[in-house]
Design a protein with these regions (language model features):
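Beta-rich carbohydrate-recognition and catalytic domains
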Residues: 1-109, 117-157
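Beta-strand-rich binding-surface signature
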Residues: 113
């Protein structure tokens, strides 16, 4: 069976062939954990579910739980997709929309399970958010340095 990738080539993706004894559709890297749970001085665990190619390297948004298990979102970068540098401070979302109440929309309680996708001219970020109850947070970035939050996708009522 031939492998067909739909999209731009990713010649620098850190690919590993399926181990001979692997039976599943997906297999884990032999180098796991890629990001150690305590990479940041305050982190108890780090989850890397939102990595994308960015300017010939990789960038992403990561859930980092501190030792009190507060769930925060942090930006990170890697040249090779294996060795990562994460921002020590959580993402603080800005608000460009003058029609929304930025203080209310950006009130942070928790964030987890982020995803990142490129659409047109920016990277959109979605995550499990809290806004008067569980909801889906939506934001975007152009550069993985400044992040803008939009209205939540689903209100919890």
């Amino acid at each position: 069976m031939a492998i067909k990738i739909v999209g731009d080539p990713l010649p620098n993706i850190p690919w590993e062939d399926r181990p001979a004894d692997a039976r599943g559709v997906v297999w884990r890297s032999a180098r796991n954990p890629i990001i150690p749970r305590d990479l940041l001085p305050t982190s108890n665990s780090i989850f890397n579910s939102a990595v994308v190619p960015y300017k010939g390297a990789f960038a992403g948004v990561f859930r980092c739980d501190d030792t009190a298990r507060n769930m925060q979102l942090h930006a990170g970068r890697s040249q090779d997709g294996i060795t990562w540098e994460l921002e020590p401070e959580r993402i603080h979302f800005a608000c460009k929309d003058t029609d929304c109440d930025c203080a209310e929309v950006n009130r942070w309680v928790y964030g987890y399970d982020p995803r990142v996708v490129w659409i047109e001219d920016r990277y959109y970020v979605t995550w499990c958010n809290w806004f008067h109850g569980p909801t889906i947070g939506v934001g975007y970035t152009y550069d993985f340095e400044t992040f803008y939050q939009l209205e939540n996708a689903y209100l919890p009522f």
